[in-house]
């Protein structure tokens, strides 16, 4: 099943130059036979050879021996899927895991409203504002900004509640013990 490409090759050279001996295309013949007959491990192989007579001598690359050659590619079209054990052992990037683990960021609006009943007015009002800003950022699609503002609203709400409890306890103690 030999392919006679010498005549096409001479046409590509334009009839000038040194014609190659007949055994110079052994590699191409072997690769063509191997790709036509074999299918290894359920994977299909591809092989492409472009031989056209429109190519001029300038388009052909030189291989260091004043003989032009053409590039040939052989590669896999399909690959076998990884086994489940290999997939589970693979380490994913931190951005991919954080996006999957954390869904919709929380705005802590209920906690901020609850903190408004504590007597630390500037802190709990700022927590309420940050919670509303977190909700607006989430509606605009800015997940990172919504997450950051939500965490800040949670921190300020907790601080407001704790300071409010401290103020309430001090007021009760001052009214009962010191009077």
From Swiss-Prot:
Family matches, as Pfam families: CD225 (PF04505)
Keywords: Cell membrane, Cytoplasm, Membrane, Transmembrane, Transmembrane helix
Region (Disordered): 1-47
Name of the protein described by the UniProt record: Trafficking regulator of GLUT4 1
Species: Xenopus tropicalis (Western clawed frog)
Function, as annotated: Regulates insulin-mediated adipose tissue glucose uptake and transport by modulation of SLC2A4 recycling.
Gene: trarg1
Cytoplasmic side, ranges: 1-109, 131-157
Record family assignment: Belongs to the CD225/Dispanin family.
InterPro entries listed in its UniProt record: CD225/Dispanin, CD225/Dispanin_fam
GO cellular component term, pick one: cytoplasmic vesicle membrane
Intramembrane residue spans: 110-130
Ranges per topology, Extracellular: 179
GO biological process: cellular response to insulin stimulus; endosome to plasma membrane protein transport; glucose import in response to insulin stimulus; protein localization to plasma membrane
Protein topology in the membrane: Single-pass membrane protein
Membrane-spanning residues: 158-178
Localisation: Cell membrane; Endomembrane system; Cytoplasm, Perinuclear region
